[in-house]
Amino acid sequence: MAHQIEQMAYVGQTPWHGLGNQLSPNQPIEVWAKQAGMDWRIESSNVSYMAQNSRGQSIIMPYEEQRVLYRSDTHAPLSVVSQRYQEVQPMEILEFYRDLTEQSGFELETAGVLKGGKKFWALARTGQTAELKGGDVSNGYILLATACDGTLATTAQFTNIRVVCNNTLAIALRGQSSNTGVVKVPHSTKFDADKVKDQLGISVKTWYDHMYEMKQLTQRKVTQKEAAAYFDAVFNNNSLSAMEQEDNIIQYYRNVASQANPQPNKTEPNGRAMTKVMNMFNGQGRGADLSSAKDTAYGLLCAITEFVDHERRAMSTDHRLDSAWFGAGAALKQRGLEQALYLAA
């Protein structure tokens, strides 16, 4: 199977998926564009189709309500969109960071193209860092991504990357009504980089608010019963109420037993995944034995993020990256964050 990552560039250590061109630090945007495979434009053409007239002759007919988007370099098709669709160019994603890298101390760390150009992104380190107890370090990033195949609005969001395991966690803690943490620009609206930066509120406060909550999670000790209830809530979208926790722990051990003695046509939902994350929480995960994570709500969250980023079943590492940042995996991590904060409240 061909890689979904058409091309990618990075600085620092080789990414966990092992793909991309390594760059030395502080390269200009133009170098990033070439090495990350983003030095092309999205072009468009009106849709037409072949038909036959009454004499059996082939004629080309226009369909004026739709356009085909295609790559300027290879002319490969990307998607079919309406006339109202506002495309965002690959260079616009990189240009978003130009003043941030040149004037504000940000540093691009990775950028690339997925699905042959249908989706592209750039990730920059903000320079913000924090250390939880036990030497557990996290760094702050801003991820900007877009797609032209209808799968993603242009999205800018703060992201926390835990150093010990390279797990990513979107920082979007203030709910749908607030602009703090994430900004989404639908493709019915023209992308305005300056407006997005204003809405995103690129500030120290967002980072410190997030790390304060992570610290709260490290201080919330959890029992095995609470851990099982947490994973059940995350994977099966159940409640974490005290009344249900007894049932959840029983259900968890039923999952374990059903895998040891499988019965035909009878499997518990997400049993394999729940067993995996429980084992990661109990010491098999990266950094699971650090005092910040051992037997804490933060450890529960770290088990979820590591599972999504590194262990969850996927057709390829590229599909896993796409899911972990933009798809079902990202939603699972957000669910894990919400449930962990519920525990610590």
Regions found by a protein language model. Give the residues of each.
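Intrinsically disordered, low-complexity regions enriched in serine/threonine
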Residues: M1-S54, Q128-A345
